[in-house]
């Protein structure tokens, strides 16, 4: 069974809203929303991968030394096992824009519980919003 390692972020703004990003149309689970982030590359650790992904996807920089409140999740998909660290991000530099063309959406905790999310992200919501 293939194992995929990734980092994701629960990005919260000053109003407590959480940022979601749409799936690319060419990806599986189209029409779903997910937390920003992505797969690890070239022996990166989870924090470094998150820094790279947020810069690539959203044009923002985070201080990886200030990352806290993180949790590890596993989710079994049909063809692979996802191993994911999820970090809470409340501070960043730069203006959030979609550099890769996906839609961005800020949602309240209530809206997040109703959003059509990737299966692995649903576990994350249940944990962080308990």
Model-found features: residue ranges?
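Short secondary-structure boundary/capping segments
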Residues: 1, 10, 25-26, 95-98
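Conserved N-terminal beta-strand and adjoining loop/helix that marks the start
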Residues: 1-18, 39, 72
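Active-site-adjacent beta-strand/loop module that shapes the phosphate/pyrophosphate-binding cleft
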Residues: 4, 13, 71-95, 105
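Conserved Nudix-box catalytic region and its N-terminal flanking loop in Nudix hydrolases
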Residues: 17-57
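Flexible, glycine-rich phosphate/dinucleotide-binding loops
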Residues: 18, 27-28, 76, 95, ...
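Short secondary-structure junctions
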Residues: 58-65
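NUDIX/MutT-family hydrolases
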Residues: 86-88, 96-128
């Amino acid at each position: 069974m293939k194992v995929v390692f990734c980092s994701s972020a629960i990005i919260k703004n000053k109003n407590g809203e959480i940022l979601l990003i749409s799936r690319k149309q060419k990806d599986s689970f189209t029409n779903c929303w997910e937390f920003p982030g992505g797969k690890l590359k070239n022996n990166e650790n989870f924090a470094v991968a998150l820094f790279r992904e947020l810069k690539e996807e959203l044009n923002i920089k985070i201080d990886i030394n200030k990352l806290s409140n993180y949790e590890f999740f596993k989710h079994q998909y049909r063809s692979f096992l996802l191993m994911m660290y999820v970090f809470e991000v409340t501070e960043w530099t730069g203006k959030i824009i979609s550099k890769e063309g996906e839609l961005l959406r800020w949602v309240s905790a209530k809206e997040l519980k109703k959003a059509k999310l990737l299966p692995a992200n649903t576990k994350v919501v249940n944990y962080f919003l308990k």
